[in-house]
From Swiss-Prot:
Gene name tied to this protein: KRTAP21-2
Subunit structure: Interacts with hair keratins.
Alphabetically ordered keywords of this record: Keratin, Repeat
Function: In the hair cortex, hair keratin intermediate filaments are embedded in an interfilamentous matrix, consisting of hair keratin-associated proteins (KRTAP), which are essential for the formation of a rigid and resistant hair shaft through their extensive disulfide bond cross-linking with abundant cysteine residues of hair keratins. The matrix proteins include the high-sulfur and high-glycine-tyrosine keratins.
One GO term describing the cellular component: cytosol
Keyword Repeat appears in the UniProt entry: yes
Protein name: Keratin-associated protein 21-2
Amino acid sequence: MCCNYYRNCCGGCGYGSGWSSGCGYGCGYGCGYGSGCRYGSGYGTGCGYGCGYGSGCGYGCGYSSSCCGYRPLCYRRCYSSCY
């Protein structure tokens, strides 16, 4: 689960789950402020936006629900540093 700095949390990725839900791109920044995650997780091998570019999961991981819905390994990798 990831939270943004507004402490909005969710357990997956999705195109529409950005700043308002704490997933996706917003999570990259939110992890450092409200959820106890490391700031760097947003762009490394952590959660949200960073997953699409830095974790080897593939671009779609940061935006498509299919990443988290159908690729559990990718899902865990995206969010493994967000607890």
